[in-house]
Amino acid sequence: MPLLRFDVIEGRDEKSLQLLLDTAHQAMVEAFGVPERDRYQIVHQHPANELIIQDAGLGFQRTKDMVIISMTSKARTESQKEKLYALLAERLEKKCEISPDDLMVSITENGDADWSFGLGEAQFLNGKL
């Protein structure tokens, strides 16, 4: 049930975006053990001047290929998060040719009462999920 938002610089073609989304989803399924159909993704494309991501003094060489993944999720362990970060960096580089320097991930955690998948219900609270 994690909700992933991808912020990228505009200009990627549909095939590249789909590969990015598919690759990130597979990494999340493996790292978090969520069901394959537990997929919620949103892409935001920005003009280059509207996306400023520096390196926090870590020496990253950012390019126009940078991707920011913001995730909202129920609580995950530190080891699950570290596995996700590593899988994303490895697989996005291999499959999408996105350098690990161009990847930033942020996870915000929430609880069962913070989700409604429709019908005005909190499915985690009412036992439907």
UniProtKB/Swiss-Prot annotation:
Top-level division of the source organism's lineage: Bacteria
GO molecular function, one term: isomerase activity
Residues the record marks as active site: P2 (proton acceptor)
Pfam families documented for this protein: Tautomerase_2
Isomerase keyword on record: yes
Enzyme class: isomerase
UniProt keyword annotations, A-Z: Isomerase
Cited PANTHER family: TAUTOMERASE YOLI-RELATED
Name of the molecule in the record: Probable tautomerase YolI
